[in-house]
């Protein structure tokens, strides 16, 4: 998403804060106003599990969302008029789809390419890179088994950091 939209990623990877759909406007705002984001215009993931590993009610696990800041009083007033869920300041709200039907959406993307020659979700920027990180100490010469395996996990990092520190890409 970062590379398709121009959004940025957290310096040390995603934080995965726990929260319901109603918590998104509180969580997905800059740290300077009480949220988890290093700065405006970042990607993040919301965990559907609390810190004890229990399922959170009204979670967004199977959905997608975007958090929006009202940068004018008029927009803030619109949030109030439409009775959307906001943070305590009324300046941040989220739009979400409870279900992200990726299997059905894939067919639409393929059709868009085939019929209209229109790419969907294509990278236009290089803001983020998914790097491989060891799950445990690995001896030299270890064979990496890839995402979901026993040796490594993927962590998103700013592309400049990934290149500058010679991180191993998880996938190409």
Predicted regions and their residues:
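C-terminal catalytic/substrate-binding lobe primarily of soluble NAD(P)-dependent oxidoreductases
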Residues: 1-172
């Amino acid at each position: 998403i970062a590379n398709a939209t121009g959004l940025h990623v957290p310096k040390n990877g995603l934080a995965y804060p726990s929260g319901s759909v109603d918590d998104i406007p509180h969580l997905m705002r800059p740290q300077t106003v009480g949220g988890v984001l290093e700065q405006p215009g970042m990607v993040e993931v919301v965990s559907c599990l609390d810190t004890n590993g229990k399922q959170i009610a009204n979670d967004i696990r199977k959905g997608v969302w975007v958090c929006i800041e009202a940068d004018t009083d008029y927009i803030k007033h619109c949030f109030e008029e439409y009775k959307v869920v906001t943070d305590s300041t009324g300046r941040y709200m989220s739009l979400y789809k409870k279900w992200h039907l990726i299997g059905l959406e894939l067919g639409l993307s393929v059709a868009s390419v085939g019929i209209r020659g229109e790419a969907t979700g294509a990278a236009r920027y290089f803001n983020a890179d998914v790097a491989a990180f060891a799950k445990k100490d690995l001896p030299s010469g270890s064979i990496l088994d890839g995402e979901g395996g026993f040796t490594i996990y993927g962590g998103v990092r700013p592309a400049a950091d990934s290149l500058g520190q010679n991180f191993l890409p998880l996938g190409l």
